[in-house]
């Protein structure tokens, strides 16, 4: 039996692990406790390492906007990114004066040092070209993490075809192998906000279904988890908190859980209408919203059935790398914490098959009105 569903809307959204990469030397970055920690159950993880102690003291980053060099059109974007990180981790951003501060300017390019690098002030460059909640990636650099394509295990997931000029760019091409004997935190997630898109045909995914997923502007479940493990964030008495879907108590609010799925309600034969509208800058320019709006569909099937999802109509959705304006994701990955392939281009559509029961469909948008016509059925 086919069920027909129509989605009207606009978009936003969210996550981690543990493995040791050893290449023979002394530099060790212990992250978030022992290898037996409950949150870390698989074999591959994301690492970080740039200095002997790149963490910010007590997980607090005091900051200020340089009024002479900062573009006020970007203030709300930076503050929203700070809020999202603090809401899911124990990292706190404080405008209070302190001896060690993050100085935020709007110079050319989105630029950030990796972790706490020393001195009384540290720079974060955030011009309007970095506009959107994707600015969280720059703040995650500040917290202590590099890009996904700089992981030591990148060759297992990416097909590199670097341009000649890029080969001389040590920072873009270096791998963590340089730092040797590291502790890894999270598995490789194509949907991480730290993963570049492949617009220059340099970092192609070995799993081609993730081509549009790469370059996401949405912090993933594992993005937040790696921060929490690295800074050893936890909640007192967290064993008493019952988190579903392999979630864990949220250090940003210990009465809640950080879960890979935002919704568990069952929806059938329903129409969703949601308009994200536009953001107006001080000069009158209209842009997409800073953050995304989300809508979720939960599809439950009889026992031992496969759920097939066919997205037959897509209107109002912009086809681009990372689906950074909006798109839709059918959670087909067997590990529900991982990002599944995303869709924002009409020609990329396929029938998605899932053994997850329920299967969650996540739609996200940051500009205007989007529409999806969705069919689903159950098969043996």
Curated annotation (Swiss-Prot):
It is found in: Secreted. InterPro entries: Astacin-like_dom, MetalloPept_cat_dom_sf, Metallopeptidase_nem, Peptidase_M12A, Peptidase_Metallo. It comes from the Eukaryota. PANTHER family: DISCOIDIN, CUB, EGF, LAMININ , AND ZINC METALLOPROTEASE DOMAIN CONTAINING, ZINC METALLOPROTEINASE NAS-22-RELATED. This is Zinc metalloproteinase-like protein nas-21. SUPFAM superfamilies: Metalloproteases ('zincins'), catalytic domain (SSF55486). May lack metalloprotease activity. GO terms for biological process: molting cycle, collagen and cuticulin-based cuticle; proteolysis. It comes from Caenorhabditis elegans. CDD domains: ZnMc_astacin_like. Residues 1-24 form the signal peptide. Disulfide bonds join 90-233, 110-130. One of its GO terms (molecular function) is metalloendopeptidase activity. The keyword Glycoprotein applies. Glycans are attached at residues 87, 253, 269, 283, 304. The keyword Disulfide bond applies. Keywords: Disulfide bond, Glycoprotein, Secreted, Signal. GO terms for cellular component: extracellular region. Pfam families: Astacin. The active site is at 138. Residues 46-234 form the Peptidase M12A domain. Its main location: secreted.
